[in-house]
């Protein structure tokens, strides 16, 4: 969330994968010890749902003399290269590897390598899964999506009416909804409010936990825009805002990499398999129907309901 708050300052749409970044950080060690946390449980997960690609490229002239990577811990995720030569070959190898690992959804993550590079962490993440309850394409209509109180664009707005976990925080005038994917292990959460900047100013991990604690099952009339977002970041300057105490053993020091590049893609549309909602209907409050219309900029996050990992976090300023 620290990284997300930093990225919120950027204009336009954003998406990034906290779990992918964490996986890369897990592979870095210091000269006095090594950072060790179990590798991501998603590296071999169903590729139709989530694919994460992470690799470290280390300079052979530097790391052989002064190693800062535990090669035994990461195996083929580490590649020795000569950053003083063959930049094009290294770039081609990186992009080819990422493309293969993400089923060709991400074909280019890097187009140049800076001078004096000694260590380059590359990761890419792609997520696509079917909704548990599909959005019927025939119900999608062109509606207004408001940038602000005076400017709007016309976008395809998906709609559905079904049983969803929904919460309303009265003092902040915030609505939040959970939209589960087909196996219910993963869900997209969307908090919205009338004034988007208000949400940006108050959002924290604790607030998200508090908001989700208010959620109950209701019949909800939901409308969200169809969107596809692709984002790419150089995280070396942002990485300083991460709370490294989560990653680092006592007495170790983190060696800042020369480059830390991250790219994520997420696509949200009507597609999905139809699944039974009968298990929810029996506990739904059918008397109090709710509305959830995302007609203006919003934040979203995809969460693993089993591990509580944040797989993807982002904001939508313009769905088109």
Curated annotation (Swiss-Prot):
- Give a yes or no for keyword Electron transport in this entry: no
Query: Could you name the Gene Ontology cellular component terms for this entry?
Result: extracellular space
Q: Which InterPro entries match?
A: Serpin_dom (IPR023796), Serpin_fam (IPR000215), Serpin_sf (IPR036186), Serpin_sf_1 (IPR042178), Serpin_sf_2 (IPR042185)
Gene3D superfamilies xref list: Alpha-1-antitrypsin, domain 1, Antithrombin, subunit I, domain 2
Q: Which key words are in the record?
A: Protease inhibitor, Serine protease inhibitor
Under the heading Pfam families, the entry gives:
Serpin (PF00079)
**CDD domains linked:** serpin (cd00172)
GO MF term (any one): serine-type endopeptidase inhibitor activity
State the family named in the UniProt similarity comment for this chain.
Answer: Belongs to the serpin family. Poxviruses subfamily.
- Descriptive protein name: Probable serine proteinase inhibitor 1
Query: From what organism does this protein derive?
Result: Swinepox virus (strain Kasza) (SWPV)
